[in-house]
Amino acid sequence: MSDKLQYVMVDGIKCYSPEVASAYTDYPDSGFDLTDKNAKSSFWVSSRNRLFKSIVQSHLKPTGKTKFLEIGCGTGDFIQQIDQIKNLEITGSEIYIKGLVYAKKNLPSVNFVQFDVTKGTVGAQFDIITAFDVVEHIENDNAALSNISQMLNKDGVLIISVPQHMFLWSKLDEIVKHKRRYSRRELVDKLKANDFDIDYATSFLFILFPLMLISRLFDRGRDQPLSDEQGLEKRVKFSGVLNTIFDSLMRIDEGLIRLGASLPFGGTLVVVARKR
């Protein structure tokens, strides 16, 4: 059983792991600046948030409040999409304080906390926990999944996404400090080992997968003279026209998943798991 962490207040935010709040060892601090600046114009962020909002809505409790925790909320872009959902009691968490400063600025009424999910648990038990593109940054992902399980009520739901397929590994994974990309079997096995049953699993970024594969192969052969910050921005920013086209194509993925399809391959893996 993991320890329940104690907090100190830093910049008006409860910090349960203040010793790592400004370390940025598992994610570049410039990533928060880029996300806050570009999230609303990114086809990937928009599509991901639409899909995950629909999944969260489908798992709300039929009566009373649903207690919700986002692990790795970053600048709060997803919470901005769900903030107005009735009877959803939201907590956002992030290991690095810079993301939370942006999140608190964008959503001053939301409860945000800083903590390292590998070190223990915080707060009350939750009905829904999300971790979108988080555990691939964590060396000890089993510790993170174990603590997430302990923070869920019985039959509580974890909605998790991770980058998929190690053959897609590229400079971008290195810049954002990924430890791994997952296979479906690897993530499912780790979830089952930490007291989860699998409700649903699907790939995402399915329609755009051929373009993603080509871009990753091209990236491997490219000289890398740019700084990590410049390299990150170059790889995640697209023209307005391309963003519009890609956003339209991503809606095909979203529609298929909402219909219950389990897409066989894609750049991202999405799993809905239930605590035993």
Where in the sequence are the language-model features?
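A short glycine-rich, Lys/Arg-flanked "PGG" loop and its adjoining helix->strand segment in the class I
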Residues: 142-157
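Short, glycine-/aromatic-enriched active-site segment of Class I SAM-dependent methyltransferases
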Residues: 36, 158-180, 184-192
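A structural helix-start
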Residues: 138-142, 162
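Conserved N-terminal segment of class I S-adenosyl-L-methionine
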Residues: 1-132, 142-145, 239-240, 252, ...
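Conserved S-adenosyl-L-methionine
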Residues: 196-206
